[in-house]
Amino acid sequence: MMRTFVALEIPHGVKQQIRALQDHLKELPPLRQQPSLLRWTNTRNLHLTLRFLGDTDKAQRHQLQNGLAALAVRHAPFSLTQSRLGCFRSWSNLRVLWVGLEGELEALQDLQADVESLARQVGFSPERNRFSPHITLARTARNAARPVLRAASEHLRRVAEDDVSHSWNDWKVSELHFIRSVLGPGGAQYFNLVTCALPDDI
């Protein structure tokens, strides 16, 4: 069995911008006073997940590789850019901090819907949560003190509501990736299994 998922890679320049945003947020007073409050995503591991699959056997991987190649040719490249700060579950009960996406979202949604349909055909259960395009910046630490976390969440909410304009770079999505995730003591490591190009000549 391999732990796998389907995702879009994020360009190096965009990762640098997201790292700069993380560094800026870390300077907010509650986060500066208690840096361990949030577990920040390593920007080297950033990607836009279209469908997490989990344990995948050899036969399923073969079906997925063929299916992804077949569906990729039906989708043209499209552009995305980052948008405002957001969170799951809520600012009063913060679990995940993320930056949203804008741009050609309909093309992104169509691609994700095809990936979801393929996953079901291969035998995976339907995804319970509606697809919400985002890039995860941080997760709440398991031992986070609630009063301090509430204070940090309030600062983050203000940043999100101020919606300070960033000079985000647009990025072109031209490939779909089938990725293996290997969990270890230093966190997850990712290995690309298959890359499927989105053709320009549709």
Give residue spans per PLM region:
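Histidine-dependent nucleotide/RNA phosphoesterase domain, centered on the 2H-phosphoesterase fold
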Residues: M1-I202
